Amino acid sequence: MKKLVLFIMILCLVLLVGCGLQDEAPTTQAITTTTEEVTAMNTDLGYEQISGAQAKNIMDTESDYVIIDARTTEEFNEGHIEGAILIPEYEITERAEAEIPQKDQLILVYCRSGRRSKIAAEALVDLGYTNVKEFGGIIDWEYDIVRS
């Protein structure tokens, strides 16, 4: 009887120790996204999301582009990027074709924080524009602005 009790106790001890051990602690899998993957995701939307620095580089090196400020008139008058034309996000569908007749024109779009510029960029793509780049908001713009 003592041998049976001792055997059961050893068996329970082995089971408890075996269940309590893990080879390694749980880990969190890191999510990495390459620039190419981000670009592919953005081009699925029909437009490309770029940084302010990339937009500034285009402005410095290219000559044939249009900058759209998708904010309100009041915001535009407080300060805007030089050369930008004001087409508030809610007026894009009515005014874009008159302001920008070429559908393959390079268009750079921004707003205050990036929300309205994304909406405007999507609307431009829906209108058939094929070379739209959205670069977020003027609050992140590290370069000169024109104050009216």
What role is predicted for each listed range?
Residues A70-E75:
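Short, polar loop motifs at secondary-structure junctions
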Residues L4-I8, L15-A53, I58, Y65, ...:
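Rhodanese-like catalytic fold shared by cysteine-dependent sulfurtransferases
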